[in-house]
Amino acid sequence: MKLRIALRPAVHDDLHGIATYFDDKRSNIADRFIAAVVDALDGLALMPGKGSPKPFRRGQVPPIRSWLVPGFDKYVIYYFINGESLVVLAILHGARDVRKILRNR
């Protein structure tokens, strides 16, 4: 069964910021990044358990998981499973302070 993908509002800001950064670097890389994110999310919706659990807080329910964006391995999708939904919390560069950012989401 394929889960429904639910993006938290801040994810749109994440994607916009990353796409803007890539647009400044090279043409069409932003489009390739967005396509890679869409493909990754589709794959996670089919197999949500394939992401790595991230123990940000002991006993955290539901557990947050992560998955690298294919072809853009410095970027990570953070999500959790809630019933029949794959809830995406953030899409961030791996060098960002993930704990701090997710604490505020």
Label every PLM stretch briefly:
Residues L46-E84:
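Basic/aromatic recognition patch in beta-strand/loop cores that engages polyanionic ligands
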Residues D31, S52-F56, K100:
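Short, hydrophobic secondary-structure boundary micro-motifs
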Residues T20, S27, D42, L46-K50, ...:
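Generic structural signal for secondary-structure transition and capping sites
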Residues P9, I34, D39-L46, R105:
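Outer-membrane beta-barrel domain signature
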Residues V69-R105:
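Enriched for short, Lys/Arg-rich terminal
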Residues L7, L15, L41-L44, L86-L92:
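Generic leucine side-chain signal with a strong bias for well-ordered alpha-helical environments
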Residues M1-A36:
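Arg/Lys-rich, positively charged N-terminal/basic patches that mediate binding to nucleic acids
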